[in-house]
Amino acid sequence: MKTKLNELLEFPCSFTYKVMGLAQPELVDQVVEVVQRHAPGDYNPQVKPSSKGNYHSVSITITATHIDQVETLYDELGNIEIVRMVL
C-alpha cells in the first residue's frame, strides 16, 4: 500500500530522511551529494552507528517544496549501492 504523502504534508515543509547503510566513510558524503542535487542547501546530517558497528544511520532534514522532490529523493537515496534502507 502506497502512502499518499501529498495528502499528509503541506508544502513547503521540513522533511527528514533516515538512511541506513553500511558503516563506510563515504556513506554520509554520498547521501549529502544526492540530497544536494534535489534540495541544495547547507546540511549537517546526524550519524549514529549500529550497536555492532556494521551499519550507520544518517538523518538529514530538507525543506521539501513538492511531493515529486520527496519521492525522487527516496528513490535516489535507495539506489546508493551501500544503502540498505531509507525511511
Curated annotation (Swiss-Prot):
Gene3D superfamilies per the record? 3.30.70.260
Q: Which GO terms describe its cellular component?
A: cytosol
PANTHER family, sorted = UPF0250 PROTEIN YBED
The family this protein is said to belong to: Belongs to the UPF0250 family.
HAMAP family, alphabetized: UPF0250
Q: What is this protein called?
A: UPF0250 protein Spro_1197
State the organism named in the record: Serratia proteamaculans (strain 568)
